[in-house]
Amino acid sequence: MNRYKIGLISLGCDKNRIDSELLLGKLNEKNDIVNDPNKADIIIVNTCGFIESSKQESIDTILEMAKYKEENCKMIIATGCLTQRYSKELLELIPEIDIMLGVNDYANIQNYIDDFFNEHNKICQCKYSDISINEGKRILTTAKHMAYIRISEGCNNLCTYCIIPKIRGKYRSRSIESIINEAKELANMGVKELILVGQDTAIYGSDLYKENRLSQLLRELSNIEDIEWIRILYTYPEEITDELIEEIKNNDKVCKYLDIPIQHISNTVLKRMNRKSSKELITDNIKKMRKEIDGLCLRTSIIVGFPGETEDEFNELKEFVEEIKFDNLGVFKYSQEEDTAAARMKDQVSEDLKEERLATIMSIQQNVSSKINKNKLEKVYKVLVEGQNDKYYIGRNYQMVPEIDGAIFFKCDKILNVGEFVYVKITDTLEYDLIGVVCDESGQ
């Protein structure tokens, strides 16, 4: 049996990254993984199909990789959300694709590769399934000291703007035992930080155990000796319970960090979005969380330009962002996705107005972030070392998710290792980043 050199490009979210790592895990034993597409016999593109810009990026990337078939590359494989959604269209649009897989067809990828080289017939396996959850050995594509871990797949929320339930299926939790076993394997590989992801992590276990079990999962994960940080992403605010707040408050290994994607704050917009929350519920929960959890860092994401968004609704959102002062905030223009209820709504907002509103929110948040960072001067944080440049080491504290929340640049006289924890005293601030110097826990 031939041993092939395989390159992979992963696009989209961290959940897609996990799928890419599982793909590499399934292929690593009988093939060699390479980073340079010039050296690859097989190139895999794991696509994203969430919004228009991500769809275009996926198509452009496949076309770019297809050029390597003029040189050493013998096969192009496309997989992921875009192929799950548009398999027939992609086969016609990009004939260079040899194998196309959806989001549930990774287990047999080696067999598909062997079959193609034996029979030279294109393969398309994009059958929809909302039963299985991809699990198995992973080849990490993150830094070796941190890893994302998927605790659930799919979504039941049916937000009017979102296509994910049609791509990923109904919400289904992994078992606690399965997650703990994977976390132990990751810890044995040197992982210090676990980042829990799912479409809605707050309702973890509600399908499998008939009750939310995120708090229990956090307790059991914190018993793994070599794991030092546990971080939760994608917790819908209406599902955050008092029990979860208490667990975050009292568990030293759980980062005092919550990512609560509110999407909007106007009740009329939330209703059109088919969101289950309200302005009053969101506001009350934020106040409760900040009161109970000392030093809590809050991130959110919002959508501007949703169909029918009036000036009054947008002004309500602006005022809320100014008042609540999220530590971190991502803002996105509404993307009109076919096969969604929102795409059929009247009063679609123009692209120019979406751009204007996005810029307005970002300007407000830049001012908020700058003021929040200035309040961190002279404070001491536990920092995870991520790397270094010519002048500084680079790291993150509990308030920072990799690649999206900024970083801490700091000096140290001794040599530090990536994945090591140190204490850093903040000496200067930037808009989103911090500057500091290594110290002891007391700040000396």
Swiss-Prot record:
[4Fe-4S] cluster 1 binds at C13, C48, C81. The keyword Hydrolase does not apply. It catalyses: L-aspartate(89)-[ribosomal protein uS12]-hydrogen + (sulfur carrier)-SH + AH2 + 2 S-adenosyl-L-methionine = 3-methylsulfanyl-L-aspartate(89)-[ribosomal protein uS12]-hydrogen + (sulfur carrier)-H + 5'-deoxyadenosine + L-methionine + A + S-adenosyl-L-homocysteine + 2 H(+). It is an enzyme of class 2 (transferase). Keywords: 4Fe-4S, Cytoplasm, Iron, Iron-sulfur, Metal-binding, S-adenosyl-L-methionine, Transferase. Residues 374-440 form the TRAM domain. GO terms for molecular function: 4 iron, 4 sulfur cluster binding; aspartic acid methylthiotransferase activity; metal ion binding; protein methylthiotransferase activity. This is Ribosomal protein uS12 methylthiotransferase RimO. It comes from Clostridium novyi (strain NT). The gene is rimO.
